[in-house]
Regions:
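Mid-to-C-terminal alpha-helical segments outside catalytic/metal-binding sites
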Residues: 177-200
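Active-site beta->alpha loop and helix N-cap motifs at the rims of alpha/beta catalytic domains
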Residues: 1-45
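A hydrophobic, small-residue-rich beta->alpha segment in the mid-to-C-terminal subdomain
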Residues: 148-180
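Catalytic alpha/beta core domains of metabolic enzymes, predominantly
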Residues: 29-154, 165
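Short beta-strand segments at enzyme active-site cores
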Residues: 5-8, 67-68, 192
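Alpha-helix-loop-beta-strand connector modules within alpha/beta enzyme cores
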Residues: 1-7, 54-60, 112-123, 169-183
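Flexible glycine/acidic-rich beta-alpha junction loops that bind and position SAM and/or redox cofactors
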Residues: 12-17, 98-103, 159, 195
């Protein structure tokens, strides 16, 4: 009960009408990348017109965006969308690291991104995501800095160097244990909704 449902509007090479085709179903949240970035085999193309169209659809259907930040410019693009009335505060931002050709998993980069987010949007919540071997590092750093964690097989299939992760549950369990280490509380579904300013 209370599970948060989030859709993805990702999808290289597709029009906004396709990438946002499910938003009329009014999930709680949907991803919104606020810029383009090089991926290993091509460009994750998010033209300003596409971003604006997806943001407007999310406003229309009362879907909270998860702002995906693959490089620093995307944070300032999100700030411009707020000024234009196309994004509503409080924001929720996801900082993504470890995608080849995008931001490397360097702690000082996350530190700066978080400091800029706090300056621009003091009420925002944020998550850090590490792709591949950087996942565990980003889990640690996010907890240390007061953020939230993303984990799971979509981003990383290994538990450690010696073996594959058995399941998403195993990776989630590891983060739950890390929360104890950093004296952080694992949110219930109800608490997560409150943190993200989502309807009950």
């Amino acid at each position: 009960p209370g599970m948060i449902i989030q859709f993805s509007t990702g999808g290289r090479g597709r029009a906004a009408s396709e990438r946002g085709s499910m938003l009329h179903l009014a999930p709680d949240m949907a991803s919104l990348a606020t810029g383009s970035v090089n991926f290993p085999n091509g460009i994750y193309d998010n033209h300003p017109d596409l971003i604006n169209e997806l943001a407007q659809q999310m406003l229309d259907y009362e879907v909270k965006p998860e702002i995906e930040i693959f490089d620093l410019a995307m944070l300032y693009n999100a700030a411009n969308l707020v000024k234009q009335g196309m994004l509503s505060e409080p924001l929720h931002v996801q900082f993504v690291f470890g995608v080849p050709n995008a931001l490397p998993p360097i702690r000082n980069i996350l530190n700066f991104e978080v400091s800029e987010l706090n300056r621009l949007f003091p009420e925002a919540t944020w998550t850090a995501a590490g792709v591949g071997r950087s996942q565990l590092d980003l889990n640690h750093w996010a907890l240390e800095l007061g953020g939230h964690c993303r984990t799971g097989l979509e981003d990383n299939i290994r538990y450690d160097k010696s073996r594959l992760a058995a399941s998403n549950a195993e990776l989630v369990g590891r983060v739950a244990n890390l929360c104890d280490q950093y004296d952080r509380h694992v949110a219930s579904a109800k608490e997560a909704r409150e943190l993200l300013a989502l309807a009950a």
